[in-house]
Amino acid sequence: MPQCVMPSPCPVLVPDVLPAVMPCLPAVPEFVPAAPAVPVLPSRVPADLPAEGREALARALAGPVPGAQRKAAGKLLLPGDDTPLAWDDAELTRLCGFLRSMSDQRDHRGRRIPLDYLTAVAVTAGAAGDDSPDSAAAWAASAPARVLHRLGAPRDGAVQPRRPDAATFSRVLGDPRHAQQADDALCAWTAARARDLRPGMRRHLRIDGKALRGAARGGTAPMLLSGLWDDGTTAAQLPVNTKKTNEIPVFRDLLDKIPEDDLTDAVISADQMHTQRKHAKKIQAAGAYFIFTIGDNQEKLFDAADALPWRAFAGEAWTVDRGHGRIDVRTIKTLPPTGQILKKWPQVRQVFLVERYSYGTGGELLGAVAVLGITSLPPDQASAADLLAYLRGHWSIEMHHYVRDIAFGEDGSRGAAAHQAFAAIRNAVTGAFRLLGAPGIAAQLRASRRDPYRLPLQLLGLAALPPAPA
């Protein structure tokens, strides 16, 4: 058998003396980072935008600052645990006190489910994301007896609480008399909580109407006029009979629903429809201030405001915001009212002009809008920057409508029964979450659904919140 012979390794020749200079490899060009491109301003920039505003616009065109456009993620989601609920008896008593102020319009012989208990169950179920008669009944059917007892449940026999069904929610809360009372009681309760949690603030009341498109019958959608505070709580809400009238006469009734102490020194804003002299007098009589925009419904006022020498003055304040695929630049100017304006509107202390320019992220101009307005706030109490902040706060009421439509699915709900009562419940839940600093209503509702008989009670303040995880 032939033997395998391994070849001998090749000898490695190493010189006795290494050269003093080793041959160099071809030089590699040193890497020099390219200078960031200087963003070019759009061809059409507001003429009175100052240098700082132009720099802010240039930075916005360069791209968003990482994380700058996102809200800070809160820590309020608070997953449930197995520890017993620590009930807050004072807050529970306060809620039940407001709900017991309602007058039950049913015959006393058929009241198996008290109105205050039914509303308390509906609110707690709403905080768990169950904001319709069917889903609230499902929440109540599975709720622990101890929870329903604390909410005021009457007992069947010695132990079992009475559990309302979907028909009871629809029939009782669908009664307009009960729905309005529930709306008023929940608004009063959330206002009391807001005063405790956020005292000493000049409050901003934003008034706007919202159609409940999902509950439309015969081509007409129910309309609700709401007053929303800047902390996210609802001050009052009233239905609008769109077949006979519009929002204008309901405006003053809405203000009558709000306690005088809450209106004193508050700022009230509304859209062009509510720029009415009667509204201005009503607000001034309440000790509050108004901010109104001017439209075609006040032609003489618009012409007088438009005739002011706006081009002779530079903008006093500005903002630049990037988000939703566009960049918005807003500027504002203020001027004192003329005698022509004061003749019909003696409450006015400032007239303002807001211009908004919207750009695409590439710098192309998407649109421009100019808005004229009046306010009873004097310059020493509200600068141009303050007025711009109030106006942006008013326009953000659309975000509240978006939460009700998307997070709660209000527009997708086809149930016409009890629509006002459950809209009031959504308002109360949203306000409670906002007061605690929830990072997002939809995310908080998802967390509540995972722990439906503990976390909603804690978020409504009826039980103590667990310690936040480290």
Region locations from a protein language model:
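An anionic, glycine-rich sequence signature occurring as long contiguous blocks
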Residues: 289-291, 295-392
